[in-house]
């Protein structure tokens, strides 16, 4: 991951200073096939998870920059840009602090984050409006909120579709108001943390082995410790014997565990990998459903 203090376009261009090129695949003795693979120009690493046909046109860094430019045309100049490459381009764009929203007191605030994904898996670009919570440094994406996700129709030549891109980012900007309202509703809704966790992570079966029981207990303890730390940091009162907390806190405790504390295999322990893995984790999605249901 890289972060540099130049213009957003220059940051992206410097981070992705290579092309992704398509080359034909051959069979034994040079036999021709209809299949192609993609390779990075700087290190010759294979990109993507399968072969493509001759019709496939891989996107390039300038396409990613076009999306960043469209983002800035709607959200104004980015205060920070971070980049990551794993079988595709990932960029997070941080709009200015004027979009900050206070959720509880002065120490629990949320900020919008635009997550741009341009993979080489034959799917379109997509952009997700995420929530960055400063109290725990979680970057969460509420998948069930439709205004926070846009699929980009084009896979290359995005510079020629700027009007369309800007319109899609306008939709995401409107989605920030929706997210703010939902988060305030989650903060106002009380849940039992014990019941919440039992819904997300059911108790192991009676015949489960000791290892399953230990994993379940250790996970629960880590989530409760995270919850307690965040309550102290945000100035909330101590939890009483009913273990009642806001749905917002309960969701963040689960999401934060999967982003920061859950075991990750070697090579997938970086900040961006953890964000992406947490977003795909089934317990995080279950926690989102429960928190939004409580806030409805």
Where are these regions (language model features)?
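Feature for intrinsically disordered/low-complexity regulatory segments and propeptides
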Residues: 1-66
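A short acidic/basic microdomain associated with nuclease active sites
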Residues: 72-98
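Intrinsically disordered, low-complexity regions enriched in serine/threonine
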Residues: 1-26, 83-86, 98-296
């Amino acid at each position: 991951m890289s972060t540099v203090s130049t213009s957003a376009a220059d940051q992206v261009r410097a981070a992705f200073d290579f092309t992704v090129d398509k080359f034909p695949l051959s069979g034994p003795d040079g036999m021709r096939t209809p299949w192609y693979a993609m390779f990075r120009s700087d290190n010759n690493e294979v990109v993507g998870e399968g072969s493509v046909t001759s019709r496939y046109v891989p996107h390039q860094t300038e396409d990613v920059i076009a999306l960043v430019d469209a983002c800035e045309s709607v959200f104004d100049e980015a205060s920070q840009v971070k980049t990551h490459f794993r079988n595709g381009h990932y960029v997070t764009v941080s709009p200015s602090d004027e979009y900050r929203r206070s959720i509880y007191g002065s120490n629990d605030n949320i900020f919008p984050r635009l997550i741009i994904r341009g993979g080489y898996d034959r799917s379109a670009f997509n952009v997700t409006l995420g929530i960055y919570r400063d109290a725990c440094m979680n970057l969460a994406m509420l998948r069930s909120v439709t205004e926070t996700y846009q699929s980009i129709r084009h896979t290359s030549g995005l510079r020629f579709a700027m009007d369309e891109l800007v319109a899609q980012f306008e939709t995401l900007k409107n989605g920030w108001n929706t997210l703010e309202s939902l988060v305030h509703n989650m903060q106002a809704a009380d849940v039992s943390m014990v019941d919440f966790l039992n819904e997300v992570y059911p108790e192991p079966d009676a015949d489960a082995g000791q290892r399953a029981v230990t994993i379940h207990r250790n996970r629960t303890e880590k989530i409760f410790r995270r919850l307690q730390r965040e309550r102290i940091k945000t100035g909330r009162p101590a939890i009483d014997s009913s273990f009642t907390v806001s749905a917002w806190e309960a969701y963040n405790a689960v999401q934060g565990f999967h982003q920061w504390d859950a075991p990750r295999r070697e090579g997938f322990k970086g900040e961006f990998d953890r964000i992406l893995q947490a977003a795909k984790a089934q317990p995080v999605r279950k926690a989102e459903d429960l928190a939004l249901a409580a806030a409805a």
